[in-house]
Amino acid sequence: MLNALGVICSGRLVQTDFQQISEVQYLINIPEADNVNHVVVFLTGTTPFAEGMAGAVYFSWPDPNAPPTWQFLGYISNSKPSAIFKISQLKKLDEMSNNSAVNVFGANLPISHIAQIGVSIEPESNLMQQTPATTTTDTYYQFGQKMVENFFNFVSSFSVTQSQMMPNPNEAFVPLSTVQTWFTNFQRRLQQNPSFWKS
């Protein structure tokens, strides 16, 4: 299986140097992962998966203070030999989750500053029932972030100094610093829990 798997990061050469860490688990390092937004994981065509099997694809961001934690991205199979995965928001989500992702590739792996892609060969029927855990959270986070930025930019476009203000007893004014404080607090809460607004 070593030469049967490949990874492409935008603007980089194809990587096929997976390392086998167990009979059914393979890892590859992604250097300078902060500059990577999407990865393509694929079968090279040299060796197909065994009948009924597929490759679960996991991603791990580096954490200098802890062993790798793995986030399920999706899977590839003989009938779906490649997949594109968005990873740009996974680092933020991993930090927010306080490393709640499962360490499926062993607890004894050394701490790494290089991101990794892991492929675990598993029954395809099991993988078809799984969905990436970060999809909904990622969408909420992105929507909330864009909405707050849009609101802040809109309000800021109307800012004037006190000397430019026209007295109007029927108009209420809010200092821009108050909006800035709200914006900062909202962003912090959104990073801690993208679904906080539901409660």
Swiss-Prot record:
One short Pfam name that applies is Hikeshi-like_N
InterPro entries attached to this UniProt entry: Hikeshi-like_C, Hikeshi-like_N, OPI10
* Biological processes annotated in GO: protein import into nucleus
Query: What GO molecular function terms would the record report?
Result: Hsp70 protein binding; nuclear import signal receptor activity
The residue range of the signal peptide is none
**Mind naming one GO cellular-component term on file for this protein?**
cytosol
Record's family? Belongs to the OPI10 family.
Q: What is this protein called?
A: Protein OPI10 homolog
Species this chain originates from:
Aedes aegypti
